[in-house]
From Swiss-Prot, chains A, B:
Cofactor(s) this protein cannot do without: Mg(2+)
Function as written in the Swiss-Prot or TrEMBL entry: Aspartyl-tRNA synthetase with relaxed tRNA specificity since it is able to aspartylate not only its cognate tRNA(Asp) but also tRNA(Asn). Reaction proceeds in two steps: L-aspartate is first activated by ATP to form Asp-AMP and then transferred to the acceptor end of tRNA(Asp/Asn).
Annotated site residue numbers, Important for tRNA non-discrimination: P81
Native source species: Methanoculleus marisnigri (strain ATCC 35101 / DSM 1498 / JR1)
Enzyme Commission designation: 6.1.1.23
Gene3D superfamilies: Bira Bifunctional Protein, Domain 2, Nucleic acid-binding proteins
Protein name, UniProt field: Aspartate--tRNA(Asp/Asn) ligase
Length: 429, 429
């Protein structure tokens, strides 16, 4: 029975392990291998004069990153990783790696992002890269459990759609048999329809597709969105839910992923609730104190502005009370000052993580807002119909999983947080 | 504070509820409403002479399926649903439904599937329909927790891809900027690449897209697939994992979703392990005993054959030891009898739920099998490359979530198990 490498301790007597050859060293009478599996690294030491000839032959022929099986005696040895090594009684090459490798897994030579992504299967063998994706897995699993515990129903909405969420821009067209269709930008309209269906609280973790021309370190053309929508709730209610989720997920990662965090040399601080709520008008004032290109009321926040505010606030925060004109048509205006709306962004000091709002649930107001945005209510009929048959008040948000992971782990490029990024130029592997 | 309707008991003194007007009845001096939220139904009784005039006015104007808020005194009353009713002190219409409704939510008139799907937001208000999707949510959440507890890493693989998984058929083309791309049929190649990346055990729950022309009660063009892949495992190991998952999920639903199961009048039997393993050759013999169109060795199983075998076996079972020729190129042939391979299907008595196999991990054998299928190894280079740099032995499967829910809940049409189906003719809503 194979043991995970982490389970082999200095006290273990004998062990069988499988893994990849991380390093090979030859010191005259001794050969050393480092063998790596997803749980850790162990040294295999071959005293050339003491092992059977066939083990020596195999050891001589094995290349780095080949997959091997080793069975042998475990010895405590202070200098080795984890304070133990294996002296093999059996050594089998399960799968041979060609040389040279297209990428250095032992990270002695650092590679450009494009080179890394071209050989992502090798890149992701690096313990630091693996740590990111194991943490990402912990994030999505913890978010699923948390939202289910809060009574949210896990839904799956279609990714092939006939209409755009927010007008016709930034859509990838699909040939759907004899019809034209699009890859969905957002589950927005569908999760709202599930409020009309009386589901009351839903969530989805799934892909979204945006044909943005931007090719930056924080944009992807295919990303993973965590979407939530709750009935009989306003923007304040769902901001609290979002805040609770963020804190829960950070806390879970801090407790459950300590080895991966150590691998990344990250001392994860769990943010504390409540996050500050900063009105939009105040946010641009804060930004204008330091940024070069001053913002006027009604401007969207530039990346420079986001950084300036983030530097001032120094933690997660919400920007609230946005001008209605710069938010999507479905954001609910304040009844007493309709030039502002019940929309919010959740910000990490580095960038925006999530957008949300209380939504308009009144059919006629929604039609008015769609028209005011220069869109045609006719093309939204499938979405508008539910608003005529008992749509409850509701609110929700969408949270970018890659941005959440990127900011949590202080990654410089969003591509670090997705296994196989899709961007303006990359469609492979 | 609003109470969920289920939480209002005959012992409750007073309560505020929100919900949809399920039914309205007028009996001279008394008006009755049934109000429905996602947790249940409650009767609201209005003694016309005893309530304030404004409540009476509101009650007279309210239409079925409008959203209302009711605050009042709770009285135990045997004949009412749940043995209690509310006599309102406040009654507010939150959102008015137009009349007539495009679909009858109280299910007095049953509707055609197409009519139902055209107004899915109303259809899903029916307690029976809601029950299906709340159970589906329990299934995906329980599967996520189960697989995480078994050490599987939750991954997200791209849905926009440059190449087909199994040749060029049944793909939806996308215009990806200036390039042609496709919507992915299956995470197969990507989850295998994550085995090369040393992740050792992964899972994904996500959409798959198949441009099949079939328009049957068990095909969808967009479906949800639960995909698993495990390294250093063979077909038997992953069949056990799949079996454990099925039993776990059934058990979870049986325990956690008793009200939804009652709504569907389903007495859920948790299948018992191990499921029978029936070799393909034996399976066609069983089928040929009863079916009209006899199968020859090397034929795929027809729906009639699946039913015939299912009737004989009477429970979940595996079909194993398939002819290599009728399985995908990546299925591992038995070394001692390469005309058979280590592939399997998990069957419910009604239909196939899952396909899996130990995969080929040897590069040259894989190239040979791709060519033997009439495909070009050159177009699979991005997939083949990892096999040259230390690909471990691995096995896995893909499980259709809709089919799992459909068979669990004895639904006649797979469209019952997906909120917004996409089929040969349907792209809306």
């Amino acid at each position: 029975m194979r043991l995970p490498i982490r389970a082999v301790t200095p006290e273990t007597e004998s062990a069988e392990i499988v893994g990849w050859v991380h390093e090979v060293r030859d010191l005259g009478g001794l050969s050393f291998f480092l063998i790596r599996d997803r749980t850790g690294i162990i040294q295999v030491t071959i005293p050339k004069k003491k092992v059977p000839a066939e083990i020596l032959d195999t050891a001589r022929s094995v290349s780095r990153e080949s997959v091997v099986r080793v069975r042998g005696t475990v010895k405590a040895i202070e200098k080795a990783p984890g304070g133990r090594e294996i002296v093999p009684e059996e050594l089998e090459i399960i799968s041979t790696a060609e040389s040279p490798l297209p990428l250095d897994v032992a990270e002695k030579v650092s590679a450009e992002m494009d080179t890394r992504l071209d050989s992502r299967f090798l890149d992701a063998r690096k313990p630091r890269v693996r740590a990111i994706f194991f943490i990402r897995s912990a994030v999505t699993c913890a978010a699923t459990a948390f939202l289910a515990s809060r009574g949210c129903i896990n839904i799956a909405t279609p990714k092939i759609v006939a209409a755009a969420t927010e007008g016709g821009t930034e859509l990838f067209p699909i040939a759907y048999f004899e019809k034209e269709a699009f890859m969905n930008q957002s589950p927005q309209l569908y999760k709202q329809m599930m409020m009309a269906a009386g589901f009351e609280a839903v969530f989805e973790i799934g892909p979204i597709f945006r044909a943005e021309e931007h090719n930056t370190v924080r944009h992807l053309n295919e990303a993973t969105s965590l979407d939530v929508e709750v009935s009989f709730a306003d923007h304040n209610d769902v901001m609290e839910l979002l805040e609770d989720l963020i804190v829960h997920v950070y806390d879970h990662v801090a407790k459950d992923c300590s080895e991966h965090l150590a691998e990344l040399e990250i001392d994860l601080k769990v943010p504390s609730k409540p996050f500050p709520r900063i009105p939009y008008a105040e946010a641009i004032e804060i930004a204008n104190k330091t940024i070069e290109e001053k913002l006027a009321f009604g401007d969207d926040l530039s990346p420079a502005a986001e950084r300036a505010i983030g530097d001032t606030v120094g933690q997660h925060y919400f920007i609230v009370d946005w001008p209605t004109d710069i938010r999507p048509y479905y954001a609910m205006p304040y009844p007493d000052r309709p030039e502002f709306c019940k929309a919010f962004d959740l910000m990490h000091p580095r960038m925006e993580l999530s957008s949300g709002a209380q939504r308009i649930h009144d059919h006629d107001l929604l039609v008015e807002r769609i028209s005011a945005k220069g869109l045609s209510p006719e093309s939204f009929e499938f979405y508008l119909k539910p608003f005529r048959y008992g749509m409850p008040p509701h609110a929700g948000w969408g949270l970018g999983i890659e941005r959440l992971v990127m900011t949590m782990l202080d990654l410089p490029n969003i591509r670090e947080a997705v296994l196989f990024p899709r961007d303006r130029h990359r469609l492979m592997p």
